[in-house]
């Protein structure tokens, strides 16, 4: 049976977002939401017919909120809003981000507080399910009043305007609708505002980044475990007794992950008089990785709330009361997404340091730069440079966006969140850190092969090593390889969900204890 996810505004999960955004799973509006949506719309119709003054329905927008709009102009007002607010810059957002945006906006609207017609929500849903993906520039949002510019670009194709992708081809909005067999719509009172006023873009990008960060945390534990086996790491820093007396959840989970990955390994050791303890990048993996786990668990808890929230303005209450408030403001997510970037940056930073330990012959006791006949061959020399470059770039990107604000709209919107910038930066940091962790896994596998043909790895690390070596070759000499290709293969291998799934079938990995 084909899977379909019901959208009720209450129960959407981050896993659902991934399924719809990346796997093309279909979705539908839950029957339980229909009554609330219709009731909310009736209230808006009454407002227009009664000529009541309500922001964004019978008034202008932003600092123009005191300009009254006649009932006969309320429809034109909404289309004008979309045409002028679609003012983004930069490259288009990737398909998974656009699909996540469409999904989260629909899920917010079906809660029944936005005064939008059911048919209009269904039109956006039809675009999503039929694979019409609006062209949305990545830049241009202040994260308050919501993500106005990018969401306006999302709406344009619904009106037969703008641009959209359909089956991989960039078309005019109308062409995309025609090829998909979708009719365009006209907006009714308040609908333009309901579609674009909210934290949807920053939340969608941040949700994808958060999900990927959780996978990266597990991969970083695996990378650290492999590096420990290269260095014959001392096992006592991972004993449960050490961590129960400082019961930070992420720290406890990391120590357990390492123990699980190393089960049965012949490449670890115990402390001796000649070797009392390992360096921080090995010994303190639970404390370093664990701190990032706790941070990202917090971010996920905020994402779980936001993807099921109403971030519109004004809000149409079920009793007919209309509230002009600030739920569109991105600050509640801007700070967590800055935190997300910092947490991921630390993972890349410590992984790069372990790459350095692997390629440094004085620290690894292996040939310089993990290649036979160093000098004639340079091996992993510049690979470590590249990781250092990414780690340093992350440190710049990790500067918080949410500490900045520029007043806008004639100082009516005088404090903004920059939350969309925070989410986008977090995703860039994630991509950089993913490359670094992939390189650590590749370097650790190379080092293990240089040490011995009989690895006797742990239960989890052996599964990872065997899978990795099916795709990524041992580097014998510089002459016969282009290391760039092998690095790309390494990233592709660990990006494939089946890689981590196979490891987790062998051993349990978690981010919280």
Curated annotation (Swiss-Prot):
It is found in: Cytoplasm. GO terms for biological process: L-histidine catabolic process to glutamate and formamide; L-histidine catabolic process to glutamate and formate. Pfam families: Lyase_aromatic (PF00221). Pathway: Amino-acid degradation; L-histidine degradation into L-glutamate; N-formimidoyl-L-glutamate from L-histidine: step 1/3. Gene3D superfamilies: Fumarase/aspartase (Central domain), Fumarase/aspartase (N-terminal domain). GO terms for molecular function: histidine ammonia-lyase activity. There is a cross-link at residues 144-146 (5-imidazolinone (Ala-Gly)). Its EC number is 4.3.1.3. Keywords: Cytoplasm, Histidine metabolism, Lyase. The modification 2,3-didehydroalanine (Ser) is found at residue 145. Contains an active site 4-methylidene-imidazol-5-one (MIO), which is formed autocatalytically by cyclization and dehydration of residues Ala-Ser-Gly. It catalyses: L-histidine = trans-urocanate + NH4(+). GO terms for cellular component: cytoplasm. HAMAP family: His_ammonia_lyase (MF_00229). Belongs to the PAL/histidase family. This is Histidine ammonia-lyase.
